Swiss-Prot record:
Protein name: Guanosine-5'-triphosphate,3'-diphosphate pyrophosphatase
GO MF assignments: guanosine-5'-triphosphate,3'-diphosphate diphosphatase activity
Reaction(s) the record says it catalyses: guanosine 3'-diphosphate 5'-triphosphate + H2O = guanosine 3',5'-bis(diphosphate) + phosphate + H(+)
Name of encoding gene: gppA
CDD domains: ASKHA_NBD_EcGppA-like (cd24117)
Amino acid sequence: MGSTSSLYAAIDLGSNSFHMLVVREVAGSIQTLTRIKRKVRLAAGLNSENALSNEAMERGWQCLRLFAERLQDIPPSQIRVVATATLRLAVNAGDFIANAQEILGCPVQVISGEEEARLIYQGVAHTTGGADQRLVVDIGGASTELVTGTGAQTTSLFSLSMGCVTWLERYFADRNLGQENFDAAEKAAREVLRPVADELRYHGWKVCVGASGTVQALQEIMMAQGMDERITLEKLQQLKQRAIHCGRLEELEIDGLTLERALVFPSGLAILIAIFTELNIQCMTLAGGALREGLVYGMLHLAVEQDIRSRTLRNIQRRFMIDIDQAQRVAKVAANFFDQVEKEWHLEAISRDLLISACQLHEIGLSVDFKQAPQHAAYLVRNLDLPGFTPAQKKLLATLLLNQTNPVDLSSLHQQNAVPPRVAEQLCRLLRLAIIFASRRRDDLVPEMTLQANHELLTLTLPQGWLTQHPLGKEIIAQESQWQSYVHWPLEVH
């Protein structure tokens, strides 16, 4: 029987869903063991006097009986159960909580909106990569949290009384997806936002991160439809028009939208459009974690790392016994190549980061077998938990590793949506060349090289006589030129 003392559980009694997260602490980071989510729709059980109906409470207790079974193996000091907006509001919350505590065998804490916002921010800070200065948006069932911060520190926290369940009951009660219902829902959301908008804008942000079911649903829709993963106002408006075209909630069909998420999708969409409009948000990406992750990391007292992606890469290198010196060597060559062609190819900083990340993991497939190592690498990266990387970025890394050597599978580079297809091709070319020139596994054997780009033509200049002195290297480069030419990537080597 394994020790249970490294297990931690976080339970979030939300207004729309109840969630449970069980993790194990491994070398200063967390490994997810269980995630259970049940749609309880507690907020829908509030009447005009803010009393919870017996049916809604029973739905909640039924869900907690499922959770209780899993909690039996975990020390009570390593369990945190929090309740949010609906139980802050309900006049008979005490009745619900008393029974909930009896079922779970541990305390249930009703947290304030500000504390909820702080925990959400901590969950994002521990699990989401990108710029340090961020705005975090979480649309819950009955409240919406908006938080600005830098690194681990919050600079402003707001919890607003609007959510996808309450807005559904208020503005889409007739289940009609007409323009007038959307207009009313957006107008009301903007009025709720207006008093806090100035302070949020004053603190500012470099990156905006969404941490809710609505944003998760948008991500799933965009992945299913082959769009890039950045959420923009234009995409939100397109989805709204699609919803209006469907006419009624029970007839809402959007490629990638699950039945489970469909009910509260239009109301969440209206709130998100209002947030984008009122705060002039350019684009948003999906967070790696939120409230439950904030609770877990709080219990573990782990510091927020400056660079979550680096922590993730280090942990994976250790776990799969990757040769770190070689990974760094390849990364150094790739970075040098990238810096030489960046201007001509109009590449962005995030592309450089993703190329370096691919270099750090490029030999992960060897931990399975040398034979088909690129396929093993792609499979592992696609299926590993990579905090700090978005789902689309994971897919790009897997695709680059699949194409690190041998003939190029162009269609796979075009199927990812983290970067435009042309950029994926360019990063792939740089990775392949870096692996070749670092293959001797010694810093002093990496030649001084210049790489020039002229549209798609790459010209690589090596030291005089290098090709003559390195017949195997010459053969490998000739083979690489041929493979690149098959997919119309011209490569000249001098």
